[in-house]
Amino acid sequence: MYLKLLQSCNRLHPRAWDFIQLMRLDKPIGTYLLLWPTLWALWIAAEGVPSAKNLFIFITGVILMRAAGCVVNDFADRNFDGHVQRTQARPMAAGRVSSREAWTLFAVLVGLSFGLVLLTNATTVYLSFGALALAACYPFMKRYTFYPQVVLGAAFSWGMPMAFTAETGSLPPEAWLLFIANLLWTVAYDTYYAMADRDDDLKIGIKSTAILFGEADRVIIVTLQGLALFCLLLAGVRFELGQWFHLGLVIAAGCFAWEFWKTQSRKPQVCFKAFLHNHWAGLAILAGIVLDYATKA
């Protein structure tokens, strides 16, 4: 239904689908992976009752900034994507969208996002510049370091402190446990993503944690996921979350165990499916948080 709605945009403009693909609106999993942790933080900051205003700001902001991140990522990789089987049909790699068009779209998306942030408070506005810097520099990190996934983890976690400051005007130390947990989790699932492209990346000189970890990749991934769950458990103690939250963590742990088992072959398509599967873990944790606060009321 959602995909058919997007495809119908071609009737309005013949190039609409190129820009939809550039923003990855046709592939919402990345948006979910950014959205669920942001909502964890928003729900906890609001003690289960986030304002409608902040829900709108952060849900819309996640969609816009994820789209902006995809645009700048494709600009950065436009000369590499054509050499990677999974990405060679992307709009910029295939020459269907120019660099100027991409930067114009990026500016529009960032401008709309900043307009939303201006509806919050000064502290959140200041924090938003960090989010922009991380989103803009992440795509270029894979040329210089084997840890681009860490930068992505920081980018995908930056909305969490912003959620606290927007909802409460303050940033408690405990909020950084959520930040660290999500950063660790992001490094883990994006390593699965990088494992799917590892052979091509080695040929063209792109760096990633998948290449760095080598044959220890799956063990390190499951260790990172375990540490993420431990940080969430500590955060749950500090924020006085109960059994529903713990059930969400158990379900997430089950998701991680399934991914570890399924990726024994390390086949690219299997690793990519493991990456996609992570959004269910994030959703399970969110459901646990929501239900925990709802049953306390």
UniProtKB/Swiss-Prot annotation:
Q: Which Gene3D superfamilies match?
A: UbiA prenyltransferase
Q: In which pathway does it act?
A: Cofactor biosynthesis; ubiquinone biosynthesis
Tell me its cofactors: Mg(2+)
Quote the EC number: 2.5.1.39
What transmembrane ranges does the database entry give?
Answer: 29-49, 55-75, 102-122, 124-141, 146-166, 169-189, 219-239, 241-261, 270-290
Pfam families attached to this UniProt entry: UbiA
Q: What GO molecular function annotations does the UniProt record carry, in alphabetical order?
A: 4-hydroxybenzoate polyprenyltransferase activity
The family database entries (PROSITE patterns) matched by this protein are listed as:
UBIA (PS00943)
Q: Which UniProt keywords apply?
A: Cell inner membrane, Cell membrane, Magnesium, Membrane, Transferase, Transmembrane, Transmembrane helix, Ubiquinone biosynthesis
Catalytic reaction equation(s): all-trans-octaprenyl diphosphate + 4-hydroxybenzoate = 4-hydroxy-3-(all-trans-octaprenyl)benzoate + diphosphate
Protein's job:
Catalyzes the prenylation of para-hydroxybenzoate (PHB) with an all-trans polyprenyl group. Mediates the second step in the final reaction sequence of ubiquinone-8 (UQ-8) biosynthesis, which is the condensation of the polyisoprenoid side chain with PHB, generating the first membrane-bound Q intermediate 3-octaprenyl-4-hydroxybenzoate.
Q: What is this protein called?
A: 4-hydroxybenzoate octaprenyltransferase
